[in-house]
Amino acid sequence: MKKYKETYIIGIDHGYGNMKTANCCFQTGVTVYDKEPIFKDNLLVWNNKYYLIGAEHKEFSADKMLDEDYYVLTLAAIARELNIAKIYSADVLIAAGLPLTWVSEQREEFKQYLIKNETVGFNFKGKDYHIRIVGADVYPQGFATIVNHLSDFSGVNMLCDIGNGTMNIMFVNDKKPNPHRCFTEKFGTHQCMLHIRENLMRIHHAEPPEEMITRVLRFGAADIDGDYLKTVTNTAKEYVADIFRRLREHGYDSKLMKLYIVGGGGCMIRNFAEYDESRITVNDDICATAKGYERMLEMKLIKNGGAL
């Protein structure tokens, strides 16, 4: 969270697997109730409805504006950032983003979705919040993570943002993004998760919890049977190999360019790929995109004298 005059800029990365802010990360999931539920962890109360945040993953949808879920998740993200600073009443500017090739088509609609209620009062985790959403801006995913160090991107570079739902690819040549060489594929880490579950069922007739698989993907190991671990590891290696195959289809050549990998899927490259660290950089900061959104909006406000 950044402060510009009397307004707080809050960057939010609306992921398909996790919601990220500059300082927080929580699972993208919303369960709505008409009455107060028994379990109240991460409970958000708004508009006479009760929402359990992060209870289970939201299904992938190319359109994040189909329902109220991402709006409610936005309120939870704002509350988490404000709570860190012990602020419960504030004017807020939202800095958000969309997959590279979807920005031009969906930017305005997503912006209107985020600012549809100027004044919002809600309760999250037992604390009341009163916020005024005074504006929002939407930026391209992936690129936001490198905006603070574009000076490192001399020559030809490929940027790859591996999320839960999508993989976004962009060329950055001589410190400038190439808008004509941007690609979005529905090949996020969720696809790997589905293949792992399928292989575990086919080979071992087992349905392990998603949390166990996630631990292997994040850390490369877990306290499970060796044969199960081998199946998960082998499937993850196949997925990573497929990532590099797709990158080559979009023009990646390790001898001609450097590769910069960001997003939650970066840990899979680190854990399951063999690569030259002098040619491939993996940014493990899962909050880097949200931080980048904040920086981009801050720079815009400074340049425009406070105008969006």
Where are these regions (language model features)?
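Nucleotide/phosphate-binding catalytic cleft detector across ATP-hydrolyzing
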Residues: 1-159, 176-191, 203, 211-308
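Ser/Thr-glycine-rich phosphate-binding loops at phosphate-binding pockets of nucleotides
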Residues: 162-168
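PRPP/pyrophosphate-binding module of the type I phosphoribosyltransferase fold
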Residues: 169-174
